[in-house]
């Protein structure tokens, strides 16, 4: 995503507080990721990539990047926490809603210059709600 016009409109005095994920984490505050669609893309893998490769906007600004594990937790457990749904969803565990995605590719390469991961299957409340056209057609229980 291009930095302009965002950084100019925001003003340098606010830069240290923008996307301050590491600072928030360091204070023990749970982090929940989502989307500001249509302002930003509706693609969690893109958002995770941004959190992994984010660089300070100036040399005197703090590094606010998160690890892949922290990003995945922000989308799963963090989302459940934000919606008061920790006992309902947010993890793969017995008794919780069966919400999950199947990713084709290496998640650990999202921060590389050539990421190759893509979502090929999405299950929400135990039902398939998205299946990539090139995914083998099989029955899912």
Language-model-derived ranges and their functions:
Residues 1-107, 122-125:
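His/Asp/Glu-enriched, well-ordered alpha-helical/loop segment
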Residues 84-85, 115-117:
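Short, small/polar residue-rich loop motifs at catalytic or cofactor-binding pockets
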């Amino acid at each position: 995503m291009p930095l302009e016009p965002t950084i100019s409109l925001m003003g340098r005095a606010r830069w240290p507080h923008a996307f301050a994920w590491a600072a928030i984490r360091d204070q023990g505050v749970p982090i929940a990721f989502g989307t500001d669609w249509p302002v930003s893309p509706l693609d969690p893998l893109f958002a995770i990539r941004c959190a992994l490769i984010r660089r300070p906007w100036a040399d005197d600004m703090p590094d606010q990047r998160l690890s892949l594990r922290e990003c995945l937790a922000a989308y799963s457990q963090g989302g459940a926490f934000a919606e008061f749904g920790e006992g309902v969803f947010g993890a793969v565990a017995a008794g919780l809603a069966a919400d999950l995605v199947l990713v084709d590719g290496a998640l650990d390469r999202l921060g590389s210059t050539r990421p190759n991961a893509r979502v090929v299957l999405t299950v929400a409340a135990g039902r398939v709600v998205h299946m990539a056209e090139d995914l083998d057609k099989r029955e899912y229980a």
